[in-house]
Each structure stands twice: as C-alpha cells, then as structure tokens.
Amino acid sequence: MSILKKPDLTDPKLRAKLAKGMGHNYYGEPAWPNDLLYVFPVVILGTIACSIGLAILEPSSLGEKSNPFATPLEILPEWYFFPTFNLLRVIPNKLLGVLSMAAVPAGLLTVPFIENVNKFQNPFRRPIATTIFLISTVITIWLGIGATMPINNAITLGLF
C-alpha cells in the first residue's frame, strides 16, 4: 500500500483533463484548491478554537503577582533561555561567552555542507548530521538543567 495517491493514467476522464491542461500531471493531489482552500483554514480555525476553548475552560494565571518592593533571591530567565544563560554564566570571559553563543548558529550552518556528499534523506543514513544533532541536544539539556543550580554545580550538575 502506498502513501501517495498516484493517478490512474488509463482513466479517459483524467486523460481528457490532462489534454486540456487541467489537473496535474504528476503524482499526488494539487495543493490548490485541495489543501490551501479547504484543509489549511480548517486546521487554522481548529487551532484557534482549541486555544480559545482551553483559555475559557482553564483560565490559569501566569504566576504569582509581582511585588516591586521585594527582589527575589535569584533572578532566572525564562526556561528557553536557560542554556544560553548558563553558558554566559559559566564562561568567565564575556567576549568568549558571546563568541561561543555566536558559534552555535555558525556551526549549524556548516552541517549541510559537511553532509552534502550524502544524498540520503533518512537520518539513520546521514551519520554526521544525526550525531551532531544528538550531541547538541544532550549539551543543550545539560546546560539547561545546570542553569537552575548554583554556579559551582552548573557544569557538573552536582554529579562529580
């Protein structure tokens, strides 16, 4: 069983449409109007409806009320900034910290060129990119967990 719906080129109705320049002359269904006109609006409206419904059914607050006269003991950024916060906190030289943060996107830009020799799309057949992804994910999670700890345990996570 195939995932793609291939057209039956022996069908006379389809051949007549193709002769007039209508329809599509390759496998699958056309994006217009099937996806763009019918499927996408349903998905977008469904997502908006789910978000509004969940906000109405469970109106939770975003946290405790702020007190401008009381400073918290330790100020932490939002959770998605934990790895970069920990990286800047652990590296003593500010210039090296900023350069290490700039090296992340620069390194990610080089991965397609390193793996360009391999034309496979299966990630298990692209070992360099898969290895870089897995190591980067582990390092990011490690730095994110370390950002919530005191600075002397930020790299070792208190394990060593």
From Swiss-Prot:
InterPro entries: Cyt_b/b6_C (IPR005798), Cyt_b/b6_C_sf (IPR036150), Cyt_b6/f_cplx_suIV (IPR005870), Cytochrome_b_C_euk/bac (IPR048260). It comes from the Eukaryota. Pfam families: Cytochrom_B_C. One of its GO terms (molecular function) is oxidoreductase activity. It is a multi-pass membrane protein. GO terms for biological process: photosynthetic electron transport chain. Keywords: Chloroplast, Electron transport, Membrane, Photosynthesis, Plastid, Thylakoid, Transmembrane, Transmembrane helix, Transport. The chain crosses the membrane at residues 36-56, 95-115, 131-151. GO terms for cellular component: chloroplast thylakoid membrane. SUPFAM superfamilies: a domain/subunit of cytochrome bc1 complex (Ubiquinol-cytochrome c reductase). It is found in: Plastid, Chloroplast thylakoid membrane. The 4 large subunits of the cytochrome b6-f complex are cytochrome b6, subunit IV (17 kDa polypeptide, petD), cytochrome f and the Rieske protein, while the 4 small subunits are petG, petL, petM and petN. The complex functions as a dimer. Belongs to the cytochrome b family. PetD subfamily. Component of the cytochrome b6-f complex, which mediates electron transfer between photosystem II (PSII) and photosystem I (PSI), cyclic electron flow around PSI, and state transitions. This is Cytochrome b6-f complex subunit 4. The gene is petD.
